[in-house]
């Protein structure tokens, strides 16, 4: 299903994480309510061109969500030819007053002439940006998106394919869903890769997970150009202000830059939605607490990303965990207790990368 301008039902309403030895302690969670809106048609945006710089600004006007939210993650897919880039900004309406515009990132495939970085130092009385996540002090149901198309020296501009808006209310509660047992006993043939197989790979859980999923689609779609090795993904998602490769929208933007592919960040509500994705042939990448996933009682701030590739006959998740120390006998593909994954995933407020072909059908 190619997503158009609408809010998906909670069942598919879909923070930046460091890797297994990194720090993600600010991302702790209670139950929370998510919602997702995908924009693929920007013709209604107000378009303004700066005749001096050649920059083009797209202004969404005020967008109203179906519920009050206090966290927002913006992700995007675009073609950014050499020399071009994108800037994403958001403001919210709080008690009939507009906040300032918060910067949610500058993006470019090639960084020789344009920047690829998150924006630091934005905290004020209304909220803050935690690398890629706008966190408000008070909930709202309205936001405005401002996108700047940054031109190359020859005047060429990037082409925007998709913008995803992932809304979250941290204080809402979501009722658990019954398991989708159709997924039990099913496993997707996602290639296995360890981040520790590469120099500098200790912090590469995110690009390693993206590399595995892109390789899965390369084989399934017979598109070898999608099979990008881990260092290639890491170089293409590096955020100088993180600093590192854990910026969530940067990772999905890398996957979504390929023609016909789509990648975005979102939050889900329940493990049953991971089961639905597996049934539909889409391996989700999820952000988890490494410690809790592997059975420790408490989280030590070690954020991590893994690929959910299936479920056992008894409903335990099967994951491709990129933190595999082959010299110690570790395996990438592992079965983890269902309860461990549920608790570990809650530490990121059930954050997911979804990478799939644009026209791939998924259930709602």
At which residue positions do the language-model features occur?
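Bacterial N-terminal signal peptides that target proteins for export
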Residues: 1-8
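Conserved active-site-adjacent core of cysteine acyl-enzyme catalytic domains
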Residues: 35, 224-364
């Amino acid at each position: 299903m190619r997503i158009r301008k609408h809010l998906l039902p909670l069942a598919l309403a879909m923070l930046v994480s460091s890797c297994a030895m990194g720090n993600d302690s600010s991302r702790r969670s209670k139950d929370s309510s998510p919602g997702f809106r995908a924009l693929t048609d920007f013709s209604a945006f107000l378009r303004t061109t700066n005749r001096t710089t050649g920059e083009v600004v797209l202004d969404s006007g005020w967008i109203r969500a179906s519920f009050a939210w206090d966290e927002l993650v913006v992700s995007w897919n675009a073609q950014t030819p050499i020399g071009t880039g994108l800037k994403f900004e958001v403001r919210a309406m709080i008690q009939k007053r507009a906040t300032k515009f918060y910067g949610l990132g500058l993006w470019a495939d090639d960084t020789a002439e344009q920047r690829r970085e998150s924006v630091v130092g934005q905290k004020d009385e209304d909220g803050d940006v935690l690398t890629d996540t706008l966190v408000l002090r008070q909930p709202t149901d309205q936001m405005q998106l401002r996108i700047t198309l940054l031109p190359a020296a020859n005047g060429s501009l990037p082409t925007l394919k998709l913008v995803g808006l992932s809304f979250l209310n941290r204080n809402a509660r979501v009722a658990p869903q019954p398991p989708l047992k159709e997924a039990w006993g099913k496993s997707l043939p996602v290639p296995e890769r360890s981040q520790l197989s590469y120099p500098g790979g200790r912090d590469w859980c995110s690009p390693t997970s993206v590399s595995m999923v892109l390789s899965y689609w390369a084989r399934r779609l017979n598109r070898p150009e999608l099979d990008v090795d881990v260092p290639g993904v890491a170089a293409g998602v590096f955020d100088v202000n993180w600093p590192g490769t854990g910026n969530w929208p940067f990772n999905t933007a890398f996957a979504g830059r390929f023609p016909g592919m789509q990648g975005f960040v979102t939050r889900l509500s329940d493990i049953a939605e991971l089961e639905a994705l597996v049934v539909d042939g889409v391996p989700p990448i999820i952000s988890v607490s490494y410690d809790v996933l592997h059975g420790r009682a408490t989280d030590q701030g070690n954020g991590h990303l893994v690929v959910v590739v299936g479920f056992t006959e008894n409903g335990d998740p099967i994951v491709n965990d990129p933190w595999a120390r082959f010299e110690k006998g570790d395996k990438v593909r592992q079965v983890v207790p269902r309860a461990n994954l549920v608790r570990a995933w809650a530490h990121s407020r059930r954050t997911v990368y979804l990478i799939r072909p644009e026209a791939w059908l998924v259930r709602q």
